[in-house]
Amino acid sequence: MPVIPPPAPTLPAALLCDMDGTLVDTEHQWLDAVAGFLREQGLAATDEVLADFAGAPVDDAARRLVRAYGVRCDVTRTAARLDRDFTARVAAGVTVQPGALRLLDRARALGIPAALVTASERHVADLVLRTLGAHRFALSVTSGEAPRGKPHPDPYLAAAAGLGVDPADCLAVEDTPTGASAALAAGCRLLAVPSVPGIVPGPRTAVVASLADVDLADFPFARPA
């Protein structure tokens, strides 16, 4: 009886990439901004506390600081302070994560469109795109450009809709539990390169130590089952 080979796998319809901590090493700059604000308020900035803010949009982080930590500022001023500090840190320079540009260029060579899906504000994303190369992305979705931010699925749903593809056919790339929750809730498959604990492998989730370990053409998880 002849052996029938399995059907050829299909590449993802799109690559939907988080920015901070995933493509560029800015997650620590964001957490440094949060830590500086906490210390100014006389509060502890332990690793456990800071992990709660990893991947969080500025407005969500500000609300959390005011409501859960009792900082002596209102939400609007807290958000402005965090945004100003984080933006200054990013403007001073960012480092691209190992393998990030190779992953994006490989996707482009394979005809897979890429979108940037970030909880950062538009002006921060634009700064980072100068380093990453805006030409590598078909579109970007930033904070406030979807009805709800991460961990809700809206940013990923918006990116998939903008590219005209089904989220279930997309591969999302994330580094935090907040972003991972958003991607999975949108129905995407997930490639996680964790910057903080909390993401575990699963039926739709692969976890790698570095994007340098990934080649879309050879990576089984990147293809729908």
Question: Residues of each region from the PLM?
Answer:
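Ser/Thr-centric signal marking residues that sit
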Residues: 22, 26, 118, 142
